[in-house]
From Swiss-Prot:
Protein name, UniProt field: Polyamine aminopropyltransferase
Gene giving rise to this polypeptide: speE
Family note: Belongs to the spermidine/spermine synthase family.
Assembly and oligomerization: Homodimer or homotetramer.
PANTHER family to which the protein is assigned, alphabetical: THERMOSPERMINE SYNTHASE ACAULIS5
């Protein structure tokens, strides 16, 4: 399937095997299966290649100048490169439990220089988030163990910890698979913790959904205002925000003029 593929043995026996593939100018990271977890365009590393990663950045409609972003799940560093390029003033922390993923990302996926604005932490993200109290503007969760979404990242306790970690206008964003038989139960837990302030933004392909939960109700909910914001952001970030708004309207509860959050 892939003209180039290399296998990297896991540093921890219980963790999935890390593999790298290349097809044309696209380098991808896999965890124990053919499923692509992260991809990088070798000609344009900051570009978000996978549609689910693009959808997850839809939170920028409500906060286009986050000061602090917590990533749970480093993968191939797609968000880290994007943030470094388009949000250079944001402090970004990427947490991953798998040391081999971190090593491979550093070696093969052109991560930003680690320093004041970017840090990688080897830790369990479900534990690490507990150190934050109202201080992070966005939490991006993309946790996959090679077979399914990591259970520890779908519990009400985890969602409560994330809610406490968020700043007043903070947004929790997670990547889930709509075909997972547990999907609706995940949504119900999130709705319960965030008191209904949850929306779904389907990715363009493959059944992934960027699910967003808000610490407090955002002021920007009018469709007309959202479309205006989308037009402003498309040129700045190179993402299809207008299409995001269309998909939000197709998927979520609404009135004639407003998205209900």
């Amino acid at each position: 399937m892939h003209p180039f593929r290399r296998r990297v043995r896991p540093a921890v026996e219980a963790m999935p095997e890390v593999e790298i593939s290349e097809e044309g100018n696209i380098r991808s990271l896999h965890l124990g299966s053919e499923t692509i977890q992260s991809s990088m365009d070798l000609d344009d590393p900051p570009d978000l290649v996978l549609s689910y990663s693009r959808a997850m950045m839809g939170f920028l409609l409500w906060n286009d100048d986050p000061k602090h972003i917590l990533q749970i799940g480093l993968g191939g560093g797609s968000f880290a490169r994007f943030i470094d390029e388009y949000l250079p003033d944001a402090v970004s922390v990427a947490v991953d439990i798998n040391p081999q993923v971190i090593a491979v990302a550093r070696a093969f996926f052109q991560l930003p220089e680690e320093g004041d604005f970017f840090e990688i932490v080897e830790a369990d993200g479900a534990d690490y988030v507990k150190i934050f109290r109202g201080s992070t503007d966005a939490i991006l969760v993309d946790g996959f163990d090679g077979l399914q979404i990591v259970d520890a990242l779908t519990t009400e306790d985890f969602f409560e910890d994330c809610k406490r970690a968020l700043s007043p206008k903070g947004v929790f964003v997670t990547n889930w698979w709509s075909g997972d038989k547990r999907y609706q139960s995940f949504i119900e837990r999130l709705l319960n913790v965030f008191e209904g302030r949850v929306i779904e933004l389907p990715a363009a392909t493959h059944g992934n959904v960027a699910v967003m939960a808000f610490r407090q109700s955002p002021s920007l909910t009018q469709w007309e205002a959202l479309r205006k914001r989308a037009d402003e952001l498309e040129g700045r970030f190179g993402l299809e925000f207008g299409e995001f708004v269309n998909r939000l309207k197709q998927t979520n509860q609404q009135t004639a003029g407003h998205l209900l959050i």
